[in-house]
A protein has these predicted regions:
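Aromatic- and acidic-residue-enriched segments that line the glycan-binding/catalytic groove
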Residues: 15-27, 56-99, 182-190
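Short strand-turn motif at the edge of the Rossmann-like AdoMet-binding core
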Residues: 9, 54-55, 173-174
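Hydrophobic faces of well-ordered beta-strands that scaffold small-molecule active sites
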Residues: 4-6, 50-52, 140, 169-171
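Aromatic-lined carbohydrate-binding/catalytic grooves of carbohydrate-active enzymes
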Residues: 1-38, 156-158, 164
């Protein structure tokens, strides 16, 4: 065994955690940041890499970013158009009509081309991608990669490799990735 891949580990309100509540906090049921560092350190000592699942196409309805249920102390996009996260989401009729992953209302879809979102996930010094690599992860598996814009994937890959030159980036693509057409464009995964 040379690589350990984890399904989503970030705080969420479901058991599957594909409805991310906070990208910068490990779900308390799984441990804490200190546990994560120790696990990555021990894995590296044994010649293994740790790959995290990056769910960057959508967040949770009950998240610090959307906050439809008000469980977070931050002002989410569902609560106010003044939320720092409002531009991340595509509201058709705020607050109750918004784009969601495959029509599942508890998974509000994000606009991956939004500058604020890209900064938070990819570019900022403490961005999600860079932060977890710095804490010991070796790479990312991108959930529904065929639903992420090529430009987003390219920026994510570049930022990850700036942080860790041997960072591993894997994308979930259900069809033949060598000639995948998605949203009327040939994808450039390779």
């Amino acid at each position: 065994v040379t690589t350990i891949y984890f399904n989503p580990i970030f705080q969420a309100y479901s058991n599957h955690r594909y409805d991310t509540g906070d990208y910068k906090r490990i779900d308390p049921l799984l441990g804490c940041e200190e546990d994560f560092r120790a696990l990555c350190s021990e894995a590296a000592r044994r010649g293994m890499r740790v790959v995290l699942d990056g769910v960057f196409n959508h967040t949770g309805y009950d998240s610090r970013y959307f906050n439809a249920r008000g469980h977070y102390d931050s002002v989410g996009a569902f609560q106010s158009k003044e939320s720092p996260y409002f531009s991340w989401f595509d509201f058709r009729n705020w607050p109750n009509e918004y784009g969601s992953w495959w029509g599942i209302y508890t998974l509000p879809q994000v606009n991956e081309t939004d500058g604020s979102y890209q900064n938070y996930i990819i570019e900022d010094e403490d961005s999600v991608v860079r932060r977890w690599l710095r804490l010991g992860a070796s790479g990312w598996r991108l959930d529904v990669a065929d639903e992420l814009p090529d430009s987003f994937i390219q920026k994510l890959n570049a930022a990850a490799r700036r942080e860790k030159s041997d960072a591993l980036i894997i994308g979930e693509v259900w069809e033949d990735a060598s000639n995948k057409i998605s949203y009327s464009e040939r994808r450039r995964y390779f």
